[in-house]
Amino acid sequence: MRNERRKKKKTLLLTILTIIGLLVLGTGGYAYYLWHKAASTVASIHESIDKSKKRDKEVSINKKDPFSVLIMGVDERDGDKGRADTLIYMTVNPKTNTTDMVSIPRDTYTKIIGKGTMDKINHSYAFGGTQMTVDTVENFLDVPVDYFVKVNMESFRDVVDTLGGITVNSTFAFSYDGYSFGKGEITLNGKEALAYTRMRKEDPRGDFGRQDRQRQVIQGIINKGANISSITKFGDMFKVVENNVKTNLTFDNMWDIQSDYKGARKHIKQHELKGTGTKINGIYYYQADESALSDITKELKESLEK
């Protein structure tokens, strides 16, 4: 399996970290307000999970231990708990200054831990919420999940509109859900950004192409967010986070990551989980290649070594 280094690829976690990191740009009462608002926002979105059984002891971000985080993009709507359609597992090692990232296709066929059945990995969230999804990913990759960040994908719309739109670079022209997207650099509003991240059937790369567009939108959000200067926009952004994000990271964790893990965030190794599509009882699944999965697991474990 070949690792592809993609510069400037960020994750949903950095959307939150960027907001916090921008606090250092403020001065006086402005910075004071933002600091305390950020702290209260993070406290309000906290959700606990069990300590990983694959860890003898909990990691310490304060001591600059390598750690892992699972990014969960959940497509929740009114009256529908939704599924974890985006699953990105990351390891962050400040000693080697590297971050390893693997996107798990939502149709991946695997054992759902806690339910005892084989199914699509994204169904784990519908069956048992955050904890079941974390347990299932740990079993699938055979690595610990220390932290998670769960984001309602619907929030992309609110975030993008709060920022006044974002710019992405579309690799080809396509239409989806009533919206048309040209090839090249395009500007998206909130509804367009959401549609842009959801299309996959017209993409020759299928779910992998969709994942790339999600990362493009995230990068666009981060780039635009770095230029926020209005306290009103900060207030709106905090509201979006409060309504759409859950994590077991504390405010201190986030601040330590922002200050002590900068080098690791600049060197990201992207792993693509190779496999093939198959049908079982008439239902489509993505069957991960066992050899490729084993190679990824080995590299992830190595990246978590101190």
Curated annotation (Swiss-Prot):
Changing T197F: Does not complement the tagTUV deletion mutant. Disruption phenotype: Single mutant has no effect on cell growth or morphology under normal growth conditions. Triple disruption of tagTUV genes is not viable. Cells lacking this gene display a considerably increased transcription frequency of lytR and lytABC operon expression. It is found in: Cell membrane; Membrane raft. It is a single-pass type II membrane protein. Residues 1-11 are cytoplasmic. Its main location: membrane. One of its GO terms (cellular component) is membrane raft. Pathway: Cell wall biogenesis. The chain crosses the membrane at residues 12-32. Pfam families: LytR_cpsA_psr. Keywords: Cell membrane, Cell wall biogenesis/degradation, Membrane, Signal-anchor, Transferase, Transmembrane, Transmembrane helix. One of its GO terms (biological process) is cell wall assembly. Changing R83A: Does not complement the tagTUV deletion mutant. Residues 33-306 are extracellular. May catalyze the final step in cell wall teichoic acid biosynthesis, the transfer of the anionic cell wall polymers (APs) from their lipid-linked precursor to the cell wall peptidoglycan (PG). Belongs to the LytR/CpsA/Psr (LCP) family. This is Polyisoprenyl-teichoic acid--peptidoglycan teichoic acid transferase TagU. It comes from Bacillus subtilis (strain 168). The lineage of its organism: Bacteria, Bacillati, Bacillota, Bacilli, Bacillales.
